[in-house]
């Protein structure tokens, strides 16, 4: 079992570096970053990867609220200086702060997410850029170094709660003087600078019948609020009493720079596996779809990164006809092409299979593709994500392809695929 410098276990490292003698651990669920088609462009390494599997710890690692008090010099208070004491400091003024101490909770496991590569962070998340991310660089990240923490009940794994902010290497969380905070009765709470937003789907994520819910903000203490006027506004939203911070299968978590999808262990049992998706590719290729111009057989590749191959399929985004690479009907000025099957003029893009199973809401043939990126998936999966608004900028929203984070185009954001072998 791999231990960190702060004494906690790393589930990712334990999973990859186990000696094979440990019993399989209970899987709580997965956190999957939107915008990656199964892995990071540079490859998944350690805690930096496209998805993070939450396993039950050998020993409980959770903490719960214990007591709070006011101090005059927060930086020199005992709780802050004690590296073994989890605490949150709410700065009220230069000379006054409320310290909330936390104690061990034997009923929960804690997992932390953020941009920092320090040991308390279980899942290192960097800013997601749309499209091809091979050479992309972010000049200034908007993701917090210690963005959020998730506490899972060890006896009731379906109860996974999310909280804004995570504990640093000294087991402290600091909310500065300018941070949004408030005190109700005896409890104090606050929001992080750019906030942690959550969106629970309405209905079951598996099955494809769920609808997009409303985005909410989660506080440091775990309460749920309506969104602020802008991402970092000082005034908090209204409390939402009929919603909670328990993650549901399909809950989205936005960290202002990256959006994560929570898939519960139960939900994943009803989702396709990578092997299932590869079999779907084989089934399409077995039909030997042809290009109507070159008359060559098209082959959907399994690999995500593909070059201009003679058998590579392309889709006309205005009509959905799938063909090979050719120069017929190309407009030299705009680059648009006229489809030889229906004479519709429009853009053409390479067709690529969506290979991240967690994004699928059902199991079936990949008969639709996102516009404009060309990632293929099932009809219900494509239509679900085309109706999900992802936070963008300070107060905007936009629908994106979950496999590459490219903003969707067109009236619907998707197109039904028409293969030559299915034509009469």
Curated annotation (Swiss-Prot):
Annotated segments matching region Disordered: 1-21
Record has Phosphoprotein as a keyword: yes
GO CC field: cytoplasmic side of plasma membrane; cytosol
Keyword Phosphoprotein: yes
Signal peptide: none
Modified residues (Phosphoserine): 10
Molecular function terms, GO-annotated: kinase regulator activity; ubiquitin protein ligase activity; ubiquitin-protein transferase activity
GO BP field: innate immune response; negative regulation of antifungal innate immune response; negative regulation of defense response to bacterium; negative regulation of Toll signaling pathway; positive regulation of antimicrobial peptide production; positive regulation of Toll signaling pathway; protein K48-linked ubiquitination; protein polyubiquitination
InterPro entries: Pellino_fam, Pellino_FHA, Pellino_RING
Keywords: Phosphoprotein
Cysteine-cysteine disulfides: none
PANTHER family the UniProt entry points to: E3 UBIQUITIN-PROTEIN LIGASE PELLINO-RELATED, PROTEIN PELLINO
Summary of subunit composition and partner proteins: Interacts with pll.
Family: Belongs to the pellino family.
Main function: Scaffold protein involved in the Toll signaling pathway via its interaction with pelle/pll kinase.
Name listed for the protein in its UniProt record: Protein pellino
Organism: Drosophila melanogaster (Fruit fly)
């Amino acid at each position: 079992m791999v231990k960190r410098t702060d004494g906690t276990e790393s589930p990712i490292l334990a999973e990859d570096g186990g000696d094979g003698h440990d019993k399989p651990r209970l899987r709580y669920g997965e956190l999957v970053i939107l915008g990656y088609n199964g892995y990071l462009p540079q490859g998944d390494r350690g805690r930096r990867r496209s998805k993070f599997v939450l396993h039950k710890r050998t020993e409980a690692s959770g903490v719960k609220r214990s007591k709070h008090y006011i101090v005059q010099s927060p930086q020199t208070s005992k709780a802050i200086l004690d590296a073994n004491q989890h605490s949150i400091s709410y700065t009220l003024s230069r000379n006054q702060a409320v310290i909330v101490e936390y104690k061990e909770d034997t009923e929960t496991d804690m997992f932390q997410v953020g941009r920092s590569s320090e040991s308390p962070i279980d899942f290192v998340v960097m800013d997601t850029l749309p499209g091809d991310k091979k050479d992309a660089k972010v000049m200034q990240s908007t993701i917090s170094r210690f963005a959020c923490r998730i506490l899972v009940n060890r006896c009731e794994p379906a109860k996974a709660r999310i909280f804004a902010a995570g504990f640093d290497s000294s087991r402290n969380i600091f909310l500065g003087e300018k941070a949004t905070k408030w005190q109700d009765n005896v409890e104090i709470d606050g929001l992080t600078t750019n906030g942690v937003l959550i969106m629970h789907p309405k209905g079951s994520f598996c099955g494809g019948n769920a609808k997009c819910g409303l985005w909410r903000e989660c506080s440091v203490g775990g309460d749920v609020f309506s969104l602020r006027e802008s991402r970092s506004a000082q005034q908090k939203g209204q409390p939402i009493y009929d919603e909670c911070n328990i993650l549901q299968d399909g809950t989205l978590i936005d960290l202002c720079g990256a959006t994560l999808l929570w898939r519960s262990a139960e939900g994943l049992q009803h989702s396709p596996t990578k092997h299932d998706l590869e079999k779907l590719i084989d089934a399409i290729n077995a039909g030997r779809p042809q290009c109507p111009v070159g008359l060559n057989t098209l082959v959907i590749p399994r690999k995500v990164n593909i070059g201009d191959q003679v058998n590579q399929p392309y889709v006309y985004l205005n009509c959905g006809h799938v063909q090979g690479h050719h120069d017929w009907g190309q407009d030299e000025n705009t680059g648009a092409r006229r489809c030889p099957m229906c004479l519709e003029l429009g853009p053409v893009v390479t067709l690529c299979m969506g290979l991240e199973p967690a994004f699928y809401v059902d199991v079936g043939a990949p008969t639709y593709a996102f516009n404009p990126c060309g990632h293929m998936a099932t009809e219900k999966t494509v239509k679900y994500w085309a109706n999900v608004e992802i936070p963008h900028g300070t107060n905007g929203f936009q629908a994106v392809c979950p496999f590459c984070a490219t903003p969707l185009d067109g009236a619907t954001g998707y197109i039904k695929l028409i293969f030559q072998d299915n034509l009469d």
